[in-house]
Amino acid sequence: MGAMAQNPPNLRPDLAPRLVIDSPRREGQPTIGMVSLGCPKALVDSERILTRLRAEGYAISPDYAGADAVIVNTCGFLDSAKAESLEAIGEALRENGRVIVTGCLGAEPDYITGAHPKVLAVTGPHQYEQVLDAVHGAVPPAPDPFVDLLPATGVRLTPRHFSYLKISEGCNHSCRFCIIPDMRGRLVSRPERAVLREAEKLVEAGVRELLVISQDTSAYGTDWKGPVRFPILPLARELGQLGAWVRLHYVYPYPHVRELIPLMAEGLILPYLDIPFQHAHPEVLKRMARPAAAARTLDEIAAWRRDCPDITLRSTFIVGYPGETEEEFQTLLDWLDEAQLDRVGCFQYENVAGARSNALPDHVAPELKQERWERFMQKAQAISEAKLAARIGQRLEVIVDEVDGEGATCRTKADAPEIDGNLFIDEGFEALSPGDLLTVEVEEAGEYDLWGRAVLV
């Protein structure tokens, strides 16, 4: 196995890195490999680390054999993600032997070194300086300012036409099933000017879609205690002026989210909200330590759709949470029927080391969790299929992601990369390139995907 894995554990509704960086290498140039696991926030951390290393004269290798050392950026959100991270570390040790570990699982160094005592160093999430120090110790830098050129946007692990834009780090919530605040700390928002400057550089470099991410996007700037109550609102408006698609992810359902909807109706940002509702029964939400207001949530959804009829709503849910009864699960199914969400992800609850939910009574049996997951996804799939069938005959603006000999893979404004569906063009695609925007008439629909033909407008 010579090539380094770049696929994250398939555990969360997140976006996976799809490209491996392969930078030209001059003679004698130190070279680093990177394995990036987990969510988009971790991917941005990987990009920042690689950018710093490129600036110091390191080349980036796409395989183990060409690397002087390998960085593994780990995921530690769920126990199954931890196991997959340990597997990736083990593979890097076997294939290369010189491994530096960082990321969320790095917050548990004893857990890592207990399994892999030969790793060179372990650092926690977004500890960039410690990672660089570890790299310097393993492979000293050898910069050449006349040869080592760095793109204005830094090193990116996404296709050229879309990019993640991380606006904050950490989270102030205390959900019982989650340990992210323990791993990444409390909310720290990036200055608005820094976010906008990064976004401007990305758009100038050809990025057509900005995917705004954080642990809690709608809480952006609330840690400043400044005169603006909800800084996400002016930030979203400013981003919407740049001429790229702007897609909001990880939006916690605060009441002020309704103030984002007019920006969507105006066309400044995409009419798309990624909101993790997690459940609908008030008692389950209370056990999760999340807002127990499912009825009000339905009212909010109705208001969003009234003010922006084209809005697409994506959410994620947990089934089999400790203590979940059949009645509580049925409430979730009934809520989904009424909410008619466009895009849905669902996960079976599992214990996470350090999570307070582990101590809750009445854990649900694995076979019952699986059965409930299947019932939930069957309903969600039927809703998706009906909603997509209603798109047949409509003309939609799409962005091209990939083009090969068989056709073009595109996305509508209602679809985020990797986690949502695609729109496929099978004819008349030869002149298209990734990043192109065009109008397509929908001709066929499936459970999650669409097919159509390009039209001239």
Swiss-Prot record:
Cofactor note: Binds 2 [4Fe-4S] clusters. One cluster is coordinated with 3 cysteines and an exchangeable S-adenosyl-L-methionine.
The keyword Transferase is annotated on this UniProt entry: yes
Major localization class: cytoplasm
Subcellular location as annotated: Cytoplasm
Binding site for [4Fe-4S] cluster 1: 39, 75, 104
Cofactors: [4Fe-4S] cluster
NCBIfam families: 30S ribosomal protein S12 methylthiotransferase RimO (TIGR01125), MiaB/RimO family radical SAM methylthiotransferase (TIGR00089)
Domain of life, source organism: Bacteria
Protein's UniProt name: Ribosomal protein uS12 methylthiotransferase RimO
Keywords: 4Fe-4S, Cytoplasm, Iron, Iron-sulfur, Metal-binding, S-adenosyl-L-methionine, Transferase
Pfam families linked: Radical_SAM, TRAM_2, UPF0004
UniProt cross-references to InterPro entries, sorted A to Z: Elp3/MiaA/NifB-like_rSAM (IPR006638), Methylthiotransferase (IPR005839), Methylthiotransferase_N (IPR013848), Methylthiotransferase_N_sf (IPR038135), NA-bd_OB-fold (IPR012340), Ribosomal_uS12_MeSTrfase_RimO (IPR005840), rSAM (IPR007197), rSAM_horseshoe (IPR023404)
